[in-house]
Amino acid sequence: MEVTTDKNQPSRKSPIDTAVVLLMIGATLLIVWLSFSNRTFWGAHWPGYGDMVSLLPEPSAWLRWVLGDISEVAFYKHEFASIGLLAGAYLAYWANRTGKSWQGFAISYGTGLWPWLVTSSLLGLLLSNLLWGWTVTATTWQPTFVAFVSLPAAMVLMFGGGWKVTINGALMGAVFVTPMCLLIVNYVCQPLALPAVIGNVLGMAIASVLAFLFCRYWPNLVKSSSSQTPPASIAPAKAPDYGVIWSLRRILADFSEAPFFGNELASLGLILGALLAYSLNPSSPAYGSGLLLHIIGAQALASAIGVLIWRQQWMLRGWYPTYIPLVSVVPAAILAYGGSWQIIVSSALLGA
């Protein structure tokens, strides 16, 4: 995997470009196949969430489950949202690499490590489902998505790119993070009737701390003999003015912050994919709850309140975790208590 930022070689194709084109073709073929293979099981324009889990462990259902894991951190759990997220993220990476003015916030914080980051996250997700997918049944949800939004990406950002960090991060995500979340969700959250998101967040935090301690004592897991310097962005970003336009962009970027993308184009792809899924079948995204629009609205409100309240922290630190309510208390509250305006407003306020 080679990342280049050389503006003098516009005609040279990166392996990333070829891989993304192949992935997009594969995703299109997958959608066509799923459409025809599931036609006898659904009456709407796309099979619902219940149709998917009822067909487990059939291959078509497993493909939908694994793809849905990519967007599950936002509680959308749908293949269209996941494909939209990845497509938007790649567009943002390409725009950053070629110095486009419309790139938005530099993806993955301007490190240039997005190809390694997303590769490690996807490998960790695949390994997690291979190792722990047997725990998922038609009636039992399990947090197989957690490796995509935790340790693998964090290790790439911490230790840099390269296959050693990418593969070891993916392995640790599948071996440390996913089982820790499974234990806490099934043996703590469920007996105490607590939301699963508590177990997910706690499990990711504990496992990540253990993994980083592991790397401290065995540094060869993440250090290469020839150090790789991550490629920089084409040009340094101008200092933001933290005005209205910046705030609107920040609200949108918060939707893709959890997988360490933090970019408006990635967020736009995520949301548009989820809305497409909802338009085809309201019972398909968001676990078939029909509450996708309520969740998106509440997430936007929570981010807006957070950006407004914590604007000074953004100005002082350059980054602040205003995205956290979007992937925790806000969607969890709506799924648990419904989509009334009281729940939307109160969860957004308390979350922010």
Question: Which residue stretches match the model-derived regions?
Answer:
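N-terminal signal-anchor module of multipass membrane proteins
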Residues: 2-134, 241-313
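Membrane-interface helix-loop-helix junctions at boundaries between adjacent transmembrane segments
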Residues: 8-21, 155-237, 247-257, 352
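Residue-level signal for well-ordered alpha-helical segments
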Residues: 104, 108, 144, 149, ...
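Membrane-helix interface "capping/anchor" motifs
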Residues: 112-113, 133-140, 156-170, 308-321, ...
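Alpha-helical transmembrane segments of multi-pass membrane proteins, especially transporters
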Residues: 113-121, 125, 142-148, 165-174, ...
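Membrane-helix boundary/interface segments in integral membrane proteins
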Residues: 127-128, 147-159, 327-337
